[in-house]
Swiss-Prot record:
Domain of life: Eukaryota
InterPro entries linked: HD, Homeodomain-like_sf, LIM_Homeobox_TF
Encoding gene per record: lim2b
Species whose genome carries this gene: Xenopus laevis (African clawed frog)
Listed Pfam families: Homeodomain
Protein name: LIM/homeobox protein xLIM-2B
Keyword Nucleotidyltransferase among UniProt keywords: no
């Protein structure tokens, strides 16, 4: 869970408004649902 948070924080720091493609990639990496990864 901590690793998920770190991954998301890093991603949003790099791209404050991630595209759908980036969110899909994050969803796969973290194992979270796409809905969870919305801003």
């Amino acid at each position: 869970k901590a690793k998920q948070l770190e991954t998301l924080k890093a991603a949003f720091a790099a791209t404050p408004k991630p595209t759908r493609h980036i969110r899909e990639q994050l969803a796969q990496e973290t194992g979270l649902n796409m809905r969870v990864i919305q801003v």
